[in-house]
Swiss-Prot record:
Name this protein carries in UniProt: Cellulose 1,4-beta-cellobiosidase (reducing end) CelS
Gene3D superfamilies: 1.50.10.10, Dockerin domain, Endo-1,4-beta-glucanase f. Domain 2, Endo-1,4-beta-glucanase f. Domain 3
Signal sequence segment: 1-27
Name of encoding gene: celS
Cited function: This enzyme catalyzes the exohydrolysis of 1,4-beta-glucosidic linkages in cellulose with a preference for amorphous or crystalline cellulose over carboxymethyl cellulose.
GO molecular function, one term: cellulose 1,4-beta-cellobiosidase activity (reducing end)
Pfam families with a match to the protein in the record: Dockerin_1, Glyco_hydro_48
Regulation acting on activity, per entry: Inhibited by cellobiose and lactose, but not by glucose.
Residue numbers binding Ca(2+) 1: D679, N681, D683, G684, K685, D690
Active site: E87, D255
Residue positions binding Ca(2+) 3: D711, N713, D715, R717, D722
Localization in the cell: Secreted
Dockerin domain boundaries: 673-739
Family per record: Belongs to the glycosyl hydrolase 48 (cellulase L) family.
Length: 741
């Protein structure tokens, strides 16, 4: 009762604030006060502290779950800011891994994984009946359709036979029947009300084809007990069944599991280097288990034969595409002994993680317990690397992906369609509103993983792939004299790749064009991470540091931090004009004729409703009046956002710079350079005194110097090589600094 009253008071205050602030929103960006010469380690620790500060609101106060954003009114993949995703949980693990690396305190990694395990991974009570799952009859077939108006889709019990699931028994033998994967979406504050009180609860949204944008979804519970919706809950909005039963169902997004395992790999490596491997050993074991279960994402949706171009049931591994698909899903009855499982026929390059695949295939600490796990991951990570090469455009960007089920109905591919191991090229897998590969962020996210793979393996087969991508992306980054920046935002694709035969052809008929630029802070952080990791890899494996990539990474971090520093001390913040927010009031959400139901708060679900009509609680949000008044004026509302993944991606990039280039420091962007190479003691001169100071620094005598001025060959390090260069300069054997040979 007290908690409910407190929430009501807070909502009343929030509504009052929304009335008082008519234009843009709170906690906007200002210039960072950080001084030149601040180490990237200190920069990371500052941002880490802001993310973890309970007063800043990145985590739920009761469970410690990371929200999608501090702000509640936001619509993108999640349709509410205090909904969260498996993505956010994986970023939490990554944040704590980097913190352990830089401080030696590894407790956060265990905490982050525990929060993940406690909340976003369904436990045995939340997936009852999996022991009744029959891998020889994994699911009942239903067609996919392009548009929500074609749904519900009929379940075809008798007319379509599906293939068999070849991985399930292997996993059961090692771990038991329950899946160890994350469901992708959770209502942390129980805003929709499908759960109990304010307890976090599983929900879902997307169900109805490639044209179903977030604006056209109908949120529904993952555990369907017929409490809300219509007589059959929400089930008959999506599938046409003979009868409907209470049930549960979950869907993963494998890039999140991949990122979590990737982060634990680094935690394990760094902790062992510190002599503290035991501090993360239990988490490593769980990450290895998760990697084994992630093999479920390697298979066609209904286990049909790859490349058949019809509904041909597969046996064994004939249904394995070995890529990371968009999802795997599983479900079953409540109080009944039945369960089902599906894979996914569509693969997007942005979800691939060959680095994680390599970890699961080759690293003993992450070895799968199953009989076939190591073999499958060995095939998978190599197949994923081929996938990137097949999809690399003539310019260098990576195109969308492939499908084994044309139009979601296993139709014949159009004549002339390029293929990859029998799968058809699609520029925008899974979603078309907007196109799933329009967003530049997938380029940075996915290629960062390839950079880590190269860094750890030195595999020369990917050298040309990543060099071409780096050259392309570097040419598209804009650094302005005033210290601001712009990176690609939207991409336009044309043509298609050549059919894959095992060798990259250059894809002269596949092209990408950047159509807009922006300052997405998370993408900027991920891009900086990718470039810095690439630079470190060139030094390790090619004998020559790519200083341009390293310096661009630093520029992106510096400029993102400096220009978007939150005025209220909450990290970094974006200021965004959201023209799409008119869809709050204009976007119709398709409901079949004759169907009616209710949301938990009483909102009516019926034909003709708009997005806001089944989310009327948004009218109580502090941002709502800003959005509504802007809509009435025909303007795009300008709002400030603190996204959890944005903060973490930028923080991790800071940590990467601190790890691989410890002598580099933050520089206020847009200020004239005052660097005097060789002036190690900052007295405005270069002479033998500087040589003495640099020698003491190299010998670790505890002396403080200007490391920017001391890096005389610009390799990101200050060592005896720089001392030798300085001595030669003082003796006039070298005319200018910096000196590169």
């Amino acid at each position: 009762m007290v908690k409910s009253r407190k929430i009501s008071i807070l909502l009343a205050v929030a509504m009052l604030v929304s009335i008082m602030i008519p234009t843009t929103a709170f906690a906007g960006p200002t210039k960072a006060p950080t001084k030149d010469g601040t180490s990237y380690k200190d920069l990371f620790l500052e941002l880490y502290g802001k993310i973890k500060d309970p007063k800043n609101g990145y985590f739920s106060p009761d469970e410690g779950i990371p929200y999608h954003s501090i702000e509640t009114l936001i619509v993108e993949a999640p349709d509410y800011g205090h909904v969260t995703t498996s993505e956010a949980f994986s970023y939490y693990v990554w944040l704590e891994a980097m913190y352990g690396n830089l401080t030696g305190n590894w407790s956060g990694v265990e905490t982050a994984w525990k929060v993940m395990e406690d909340w976003i991974i369904p436990d045995s009570t939340e997936q009852p009946g999996m022991s009744s799952y029959n891998p020889n009859s994994p699911a009942t077939y239903a067609d996919e359709y392009e548009d929500p108006s074609y749904y519900p889709s009929e379940l075809k019990f008798d007319t379509v036979r599906v293939g068999s699931d070849p991985v399930h028994n292997d996993l059961v033998s090692a771990y038991g029947p329950n899946m160890y994967l994350m469901h992708w979406l959770m209502d942390v504050d129980n805003w929709y009300g499908f759960g109990t009180g304010t307890r976090a609860t599983f929900i879902n949204t997307f169900q109805r084809g490639e044209q179903e944008s977030t604006w056209e979804t109908i949120p529904h519970p993952s555990i369907e007990e017929f409490k809300y919706g219509g007589p059959n809950g929400f089930l008959d909005l999506f599938t046409k069944d003979r009868s409907y039963a209470k049930q549960w169902r979950y869907t993963n997004a494998p890039d999140a599991e991949g990122r979590a395992i990737q982060a634990v790999y680094w935690a394990n490596k760094w902790a062992k280097e510190q002599g503290k491997g035991s501090a993360v050993a239990s988490v490593v074991s769980k990450a290895a288990k998760m990697g084994d279960f992630l093999r479920n994402d390697m298979f066609d949706k209904y286990f049909m034969k790859i490349g058949a171009q019809d509904k041909t049931p597969a046996t064994g591994y004939d249904s394995a595409h070995y890529l990371m698909a968009w999802y795997t899903a599983w479900g079953g009855g409540i109080g009944a002994s039945w369960a089902w499982k599906i894979g996914c026929s569509h693969a997007h390059f942005g979800y691939q993680n060959p680095f994680q695949g390599w970890v699961s295939a080759t690293q003993s600490d992450f070895a799968p317990k199953s009989s076939n796990g190591k073999r499958d991951w060995t095939t998978s990570y190599k197949r994923q690397l081929e996938f990137y090469q097949w999809l690399q455009s003539a310019e260098g960007g990576i195109a969308g992906g492939a499908t084994n089920s044309w139009n979601g109905r296993y139709e014949k591919y159009p004549a002339g369609t390029s293929t990859f191991y029998g799968m058809a090229y699609v520029p925008h897998p899974v979603y078309a509103d907007p196109g799933s590969n329009q967003w530049f962020g997938f380029q940075a996210w996915s290629m960062q993983r390839v950079m880590e793979y190269y860094l750890e393996t030195g595999d020369s087969s990917v050298k040309n792939l990543i060099k071409k991508w780096v050259d392309w992306v570097m040419s598209e980054i804009k650094l302005y004299d005033d210290g601001t920046f712009a990176i690609p935002s939207d991409l336009e694709w044309s043509g298609q790749p050549d059919t894959w035969t095992g060798t990259y052809t250059g894809n002269p008929n596949l092209h990408v064009r950047v159509t807009s630029y922006g300052t997405d802070l998370g993408v900027a952080g991920s891009l900086a991470n990718a470039l810095a990791t690439y630079a470190a890899a060139t030094e390790r494996w090619e004998g020559k540091l790519d200083t341009k990539a390293r310096d661009m990474a630093a520029e992106l971090v510096n400029r993102a931090w400096y220009n978007f520093y939150c005025s209220e001390g909450k990290g970094v913040v974006t200021e965004e004009a959201r023209a799409d927010y008119k869809r709050f009031f204009e976007q119709e959400v398709y409901v079949p004729a004759g169907w009616s139901g209710t949301m938990p708060n009483g909102d009516k679900i019926q034909p003709g409703i708009k997005f806001i009509d089944i989310r009327t609680k948004y009218r109580q949000d502090p941002y709502y009046d800003i959005v509504y008044q802007a809509y009435l004026r025909g303007e795009a509302p300008v709002l400030n956002y603190h996204r959890f993944w944005h903060e973490v991606d930028l923080a991790v990039a800071m940590g990467v710079l601190a790890t691989y280039f410890p002598d580099m420091t933050y520089k206020v962007p847009g200020t004239p350079s005052t660097k005097l190479y060789g002036d190690v003691n900052d007295d405005g001169k270069v002479n033998s005194t500087d040589a003495v100071a640099l020698k003491r620094y190299v010998l670790r005598s505890g002396i403080s110097i200007n490391t920017d001025n001391a890096d005389l060959n610009e390799d990101g390090r200050v060592n005896s090589t720089d001392l030798g260069i300085l001595k030669r300069y003082i003796l006039k054997e070298i005319d200018t600094l910096p000196y590169k040979n």
